[in-house]
């Protein structure tokens, strides 16, 4: 919207340049001719200082609205009306900007992205969600060895916190050994300080994928598709306890029976056994 002041300036300019009469210019711009006779008075020195102070405070405190800025002015002894402060801020383009999206906290990777070339070199973990027959939530932590595609653990519960994540990892390490790296997204359970400190203490390097890039954790994403297609979508769980039993049975089937195309159609356990005979497993 063009202000009256800007319209008056436009009228004066076209009249001075002889482009048209004042009457015609006012009619075209929707401005009364009497208003063109108006000449703004120069602001007194005290007002100029107040304006400068409003601008200075508004820039120093960009998240403050005009009410808070006025409160600061009154505290300093200035006489400033609410509408005056609001108008000056608007004219100077000093309104409070909308909040941008909050930056999500991310985990700190301690190793470069690594492609597994042997057992226990890279493990990955992630969560998958489902529901029981009565609508209660199920949360599953899955843990796998990226080289053999073995599913090392699936922990099932209604809720899983950082402590549960560490318990599941410790159980898998007791059975299999310590991995060199572990890959995950930036979920709160994986970037929790408790988890990062424990992994550092165990000498396990962390690899956090970029936010919104699940393909960087492609092995476990592919496994989740298999888990959902072959198990979760085929079953109706009446309780968490039943879900634990059924999902654990499927995990055993996947490791011992499921022929994997990337493993030459060996099942994950067969592949792990064959490569373990050729080289020692790190961490055992």
Could you tell me what each predicted segment is?
Residues 1-284:
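Charged DNA-binding/catalytic regions of mobile-element recombinases
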